[in-house]
Amino acid sequence: MSESVLETERYAHEELERLQQAIVDRQVANPKAPRERLRLEHQSAQFLNQFRETSKKLLVSHESSDRLKDQEVARINADDDLTEFYKSLGEIQEFHKKYPDHKVEDLSQLYSIKPSQPGIDEIDTLFRGEEMYGRFMDLNECYEEYINLSNVQHISYLEYLKNLEDFDQIPKPEKNQTYINYITHLYEYLVSFYRRTHPLSNLDKIIAVFDTEFDAAWEAGLPGWYSHNAEAEKDGKDSTEAFYCEVCQKFFGKITVFEAHKKSKAHNKAVKRMQSSSPSTTSNTNEKQKGPKAIARIEFLIKKLTSLLDDVRKDTRENVVRRQTLTAAERLAEVEAAEREAFEQSTPSVSVEGNQDEESDQDDEEKIYNPLKLPLGWDGKPIPFWLWKLHGLGKEFPCEICGNYVYMGRKAFDKHFTEQRHIYGLKCLGISPSPLFNQITSIDEALQLWQKYKVDSKKRETTMASLNEMEDDEGNVMSEKVYNDLKAQGLL
C-alpha cells in the first residue's frame, strides 16, 4: 500500500510528538545509577538528532510544491469527500486482507523506556573499565606518551594528573612532532570523554567559543607565545615563530642556531621534498595544523577542557591514591562489586506512564548478593571491601569468658570488656569486674590472676597494719597488732 504525501507528513508530525514525549520521560526518570543515567541521556541525544532530521524533512515537504500533494488536498476539499474517504478505507482493508501478518509500527512502544537487558549494553561499549561509566578518567596511555617525551622529568601518574595542563615546563625547542602527537592524543581523549559523559551538551559550540577566546588571546599576546614576529623582535623579546621551521617542524632556542639550520643539508632536503610533493599535501588545511599557533591552540583547548572536567580529575586523583593501598585481589573484588551494583540499579524506577515500577521494588527486597560475607551498612547493603579491610573486620578475636563468642575486628573486641556479656561471665567465675582483667579472655588465666590478686590484697592489708604504730601510757611505741594483743590480755 503506497502512502500518500499527506499521510507521510501526518506520520512525521506524530513521530515528532512521540520523540518529544520520549525525551521528557527520560529527563523525568532521573535514575540514581550513573550507568542508567548515561544510558537514558545517550538515548535522549539520539532522539534529539532524529528530531532535527525529521523536522528538516517535514519543513522541506511543507515548503515544496508537489503536484500529488495538491491533488490530494483537492480531493479532500471536494464535495464528495465521503466517497474519497470510503475509497481510502477500502484500499486499507484490502491491503490488510492481502497481508494479514503485516505488523503496524507502534511509536509509543518504540520510544518507551525499556529496562536494560542481560548482557552487554550499548553504554558498556562506550567506557573502559578504569573509567567506571564516566566517574574517572583513564589517562594511562597519555601518561606513557608524556614520560617518553625528550627532556621531560619522569613523574608519577598522580603528579601527572595534578599538572595535566602545565605545558610551560616543557621547553619550546622540545615541542616537536612527537609532542604534537601527544597533545593531540590528549585533546582527542578529553573531547571524547566529555562527549560520552555529557551527551546532551553541545560541545562543538563550546569549542567554537574557546576558539574565539584563543584568537583574541593570541592577538593580544598569549603568555609564552607571540603572534607577530616583528613586534616581538622590536620589543627585544624572543619571537617564538621566528625560531620555528615550518618545513622541518622544529623549534630552535636561539636565532643563530635557527639560521644555521636553514643552511644545513637536512633543511635543504626537506625543502626539496616539499616542493616536489603534490599540491594537496601543501594545502591551507595542513598549514593550519602546523606551526606554533596550532600547538598553542591545542594547549589552550586542553586547559579549557580540563577546567570543565576539574571535578572528574579530582575524583580520579583520589581514586588513584585509594587504589594504591589495595592489593590486586581487593581491586578485582571492588571492580566486580561496582559492576554488580551498576547492573542491579540499572532497572528504571519509573514506567512509561510515570508510575513507580512495583517489580523493581520487589527486586530490591530480595536477598542481597554478598559472597564475601561482609557486614551490612546503614543502608542494608554490604560495606565496601576496602572499608572492611581498613578496620580489620576479617580478624577473629574469640573470648572464652563470654562463652567462646567470636568478635570481628579489634574495635569490637576492645569494646566488649565493658559490656554486659563479659561482666556476667566474670561474675559467674566469682571474679569481681575490674580493669585489671582487660585483654584476659582465658578462664584459667582469669582465675589465676584472681587468686594472685586476692593474695596480694591480703599482703597489702598486712603491710598496712604493720605500718601503723601505737603508744601506751608509759610512752612505749609498738605496732598496732602488738598493742591490740597486749591490751586484750590486760597487760596495758
From Swiss-Prot:
Kindly report the protein's main subcellular placement as a broad class. Answer: nucleus
Top-rank taxon, per record: Eukaryota
ZnF Matrin-type residues are 397-428
Question: Residues where Phosphoserine occurs?
Answer: S360
Provide ranges: composition bias, Low complexity.
276-286
Subcellular location per the Swiss-Prot or TrEMBL entry: Nucleus; Cytoplasm
Keywords on record: Cytoplasm, Metal-binding, Nucleus, Phosphoprotein, Zinc, Zinc-finger
UniProt feature, compositional bias: Acidic residues = 355-365
Zinc fingers (C2H2-type), as residue ranges, are 243-267
State the GO CC annotations: cytosol; nucleus; spliceosomal complex; U2 snRNP; U2-type prespliceosome
List this protein's GO terms for biological process. mRNA cis splicing, via spliceosome; mRNA splicing, via spliceosome
Database matches in PROSITE patterns:
ZF_MATRIN (PS50171), ZINC_FINGER_C2H2_1 (PS00028), ZINC_FINGER_C2H2_2 (PS50157)
**What ranges does the record give for the region Disordered, renumbered to this chain?**
268-291, 337-365
What stretches pass through the bilayer?
Answer: none
> Locations of Polar residues compositional bias?
345-354
Q: Can you provide one Gene Ontology molecular function annotated for this UniProt record?
A: RNA binding
Q: Could you give the subunit structure recorded for this chain? A: Belongs to the 40S cdc5-associated complex (or cwf complex), a spliceosome sub-complex reminiscent of a late-stage spliceosome composed of the U2, U5 and U6 snRNAs and at least brr2, cdc5, cwf2/prp3, cwf3/syf1, cwf4/syf3, cwf5/ecm2, spp42/cwf6, cwf7/spf27, cwf8, cwf9, cwf10, cwf11, cwf12, prp45/cwf13, cwf14, cwf15, cwf16, cwf17, cwf18, cwf19, cwf20, cwf21, cwf22, cwf23, cwf24, cwf25, cwf26, cyp7/cwf27, cwf28, cwf29/ist3, lea1, msl1, prp5/cwf1, prp10, prp12/sap130, prp17, prp22, sap61, sap62, sap114, sap145, slu7, smb1, smd1, smd3, smf1, smg1 and syf2.
Its function?
Involved in mRNA splicing where it associates with cdc5 and the other cwf proteins as part of the spliceosome.
Query: What family is this?
Result: Belongs to the SF3A3 family.
UniProt name for this protein: Pre-mRNA-splicing factor sap61
- State the organism named in the record: Schizosaccharomyces pombe (strain 972 / ATCC 24843) (Fission yeast)
